[in-house]
Regions:
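Extracellular ligand-binding interfaces
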Residues: 1-59, 69, 83-88, 93-94
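Eukaryote-biased detector of low-complexity, proline/serine/threonine-rich segments
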Residues: 64-72
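Short beta-strand-plus-loop segments that form exposed binding edges in beta-rich domains
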Residues: 75-82
Length: 95
């Protein structure tokens, strides 16, 4: 899984993994949402089994994430709320 040490603002964020996996010839990414605590440093563990396959934001029925196919990662705010945000990321680890 992915372990994040961060300080948040109480909003929900999405961790995205890009992979070599394909769906109809196009690259599949895997998303997992996580909540933050306003103003508190804390650790978030996201098990690989918690990542959902997506293509351009649309949920797919498969395939399950294979950690050996991960090619990149990123962080998104995808809660559809306008306004400022404050997320401080201290570390990212795989476990």
């Amino acid at each position: 899984g992915i372990r994040l040490h961060l300080r948040g603002d109480g909003r929900r964020y999405t961790w995205r993994l890009t992979t070599d996996a394909r769906w109809r010839g196009r690259q599949v990414s895997y998303w997992a949402d996580f909540d933050t605590r306003d103003g508190e440093w804390h650790t978030v563990d996201i098990p690989f089994a918690g990542f959902i396959p997506r293509f351009r934001g649309y949920r797919l029925d498969g395939p399950a994430l294979s950690s050996d196919q991960i090619t990149g990662m990123g962080l998104m705010i995808y809660d559809k709320q306008d306004g400022p945000f404050d997320l401080r990321l201290a570390s990212v680890h795989a476990y």
